[in-house]
Amino acid sequence: ASLRLWPYDTPSGSVLVYGPGLLRTAALRDSTVHLTGDTAAPAGLEVWGPRGADAVTWNGRAVPTVATGADSLRAVAPLPGVPKLRLPALGGWRARTENPESAPGFDDSAWRVADKKASHSTTPVPEGRPVLFADDYGFHYGDVWYRGTLTDAAGLESVKLSYSTGTLGLLMAWLDGEPLGTHRMPVPDNSTIRKGTWTDTAVFEVPGQLRAGGRHVLSVLVRRMAHDQDGASRDTHKAARGLTAVSFTGGAPKAVWRIQGEAAPDPVRGPLNNGGLYGERAGWHLPGFPDGDWEPVAFPRAEWRQGVTWYRTTFRLAVPTGVDASVGLTLQDDPGRAYRAQIFLNGWNLGQYVNDVGPQHTFVLPNGILRTRGTNTLALAVLSEARTASGPGRVELTLLGGTAGGVPVAAVHSPGR
């Protein structure tokens, strides 16, 4: 019972309140005790206040009370609990595939040429090779693309791509638009759980039909998975991210590399909101983006494709005034399916779901970004490895909790297209 007993000091004297799940504020004006707070279920209310207090309000509404022999005011009826809240099913999805950067004819003339000889990173630059580290070209967050134009590539048998990422980083490659495959960093175990930077080399065999001489285009997408936090101040946050070196066997082609990462930072959502996916740079995650010509689809999905597919939908919530509801987005699928989904709500990046690793399946949709009394835009950027069918599987809104009361939350500015 003491868990529902709330002492509160006011300039007019102390107040003791029994009953509600949470007391937020108490104030005495004239002879009325004004209370605000939350109730998850119907609850009684009893108030002990300074001498002369003879009335009570709860969240701005008068509460009929009776005086007791214990010098308290007791509510005649319980305070109301939270009404039953219903969340809509998510439907009306539309989809579009991307990664045109993998096509040999893609126009990369506006991309940065990766030809630096020295780096600000603590990672050594391979001797005689250009710097490929993304940060040295101004790309610090999210995914980064590379395109290498190869000449004199006759006899090329395999490609070796060395790269550096944070936890669970991955790399996928295409040659002349044909998928070469995906490589990913291992899932940490107890001995590596605190490891901040992961490095490895992916080796891809070149298909026979692509071994002819002439011009070829090698396209590489790296999911960098953030920088080391460097809590010990050892400059580990300066370790390279992205490709670190490229080599070939069976041939010695000349390579000219170009790099593209995130666009200019969103002036409202900030630089951490977006990476270098084509859809991110084109605003596919934003409210109001014209997706009317996208393909209508339904979940669950089973796509066999290396690369990125975007899914968009809208949904409307109608949480009653005076109710504080916490809502999450839950994704569920066969854990053997290898794909990831970046989650954007009203243009805001709320996290990444890794289906075959987890453990997180529910992502909080913060009120303010979430319009609890309005229309919302949800976008998923799904990165598929192609070694399994990829989803999404089941995607649904989840009620994480609700109370009558709460604190009003202003809508967060979420500009769109």
Give the ranges of each region predicted by the language model.
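Non-catalytic C-terminal accessory domains or segments of carbohydrate-active enzymes
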Residues: 1-370, 377, 383-417
